[in-house]
Amino acid sequence: MTMRDDLPLVDRDLVDEAAFGGEEGELPLEEQFSLSSYGTSDFFVSSAYSRLPPHTQPVFSKRVILFLWSFLVLKPLEMVAAGMYYGLTGRVVAPACILAAIVGYYVTWAVRALLLYVNIKRDRLPLSAPVFWGMSVFLGGTALCALFAAAHETFSPDGLFHFIATNQMLPPTDPLRTRALGIACAAGASMWVAAADSFAASANFFLARFWTRAILNAPVAF
């Protein structure tokens, strides 16, 4: 027995190495899987590929900037494009589905903020398991709704392509032609971007917590 900084250390001759995993490289699969998450270049670590600035001042990461841009700029523009498309064509199904998916995204953030505030006041975890699964199903449902709406409006016989083809027959100098084609292109892009963004939000909410559950091997709610 030796001492270092007043802490007793076990004699190395008394340590049974077989009790600690045997030969090198023979760790159980679940331990190797868990330890892989602590690598500096792990794909699942959000800061693994971040470039830290030389100064010590706190800065926003690129993920935060993209989130703020999507939350405050991109999604409102998508709603404006859907509204203009409805006003020009009178087709209500696809714009309504896109608007519902975007509004549902904002509602989930409001619910999460409210639950976070209430549960912190009560000294509880932010999200319970039923709330987590409910929000996961809700976000997944809004993503599917946005995808089906974008696909139906784009490829239906009287949908977006038909509207574009009809307005392309107008004279090139007609201002209605330019306006209609511009709104149609903006609406088509906004519908597919909204669908992709809805799937990204659903996957980001679910997979991060599912991954943590797999790593810790215990149910988590946050």
UniProtKB/Swiss-Prot annotation:
It is found in: Virion; Host Golgi apparatus membrane; Host nucleus membrane. InterPro entries: Herpes_UL20. One of its GO terms (cellular component) is virion component. The chain crosses the membrane at residues 64-84, 98-118, 131-151, 180-200. It is a multi-pass membrane protein. It comes from the Viruses. Belongs to the alphaherpesvirinae UL20 family. This is Protein UL20. It comes from Human herpesvirus 1 (strain 17) (HHV-1).
